[in-house]
Amino acid sequence: DLTHAFDRHTIYWPTDTGGFKKTTVWEGQTEGGYYYSAYAYASAEHGGTHLDAPIHFAADRPTADKVPLARLFGPAALIDLQPSAASDPDALLSEADISAFESAHGPIAADSIVLVRTGWSARWPQRKAYLGDDTPGDASKLHFPGVSAEAARVLVARKVAAVGIDTASIDHGPSKDFMAHRVLLDAEIPVFENLTALDKLPARGAWVVALPMKIGGGSGGPLRAMAILPRKR
């Protein structure tokens, strides 16, 4: 399971101060003598483990409900950025990192789902540790790893199906131009953010299934992501 549970601890982008709200419609015994529970919830699209649909940063691109299913499952290529992230909280996946991965594990095939492991999910749900700052409404002082524009362009050239990361954004915390978002989403490559448990995956051999809520006209939405691990021999 690559998904953080949605609850009162769920981390959202700092400018969204609403958080995740769950209210009880009914919980307990009914007049009929049986137990029944039902709840209502409210959430922004871009919080917790979620999808960024192409429309999020690229005009006239697919909305959440129009992302092709073929982009939401496929073979994983997991690139480990943890060594860089351990010494630099603003580390960026580089073109050289992709080249090193391919030298060790072979070319990234078209329709792969590329996952970037930074180790940041271990900081969840501590907002300041995870985001680098916990000032409500202020996204100007964030620090966490991400993907460089150059690396994003390489992944577009590889014709990958999707790109995911275990941080709050595919762009690193200090980004002001969000070029990784712009490059990937303009190419209609969806992004999965706030993933977890990437430490359980091998560099090659896993399959990823990442199914978002089908929000009509949405720019993203809550995501249930999972990996199917290769059989041990």
Residue ranges: model-predicted function:
Residues 1-233:
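Active-/binding-site microenvironments in catalytic and ligand-binding cores
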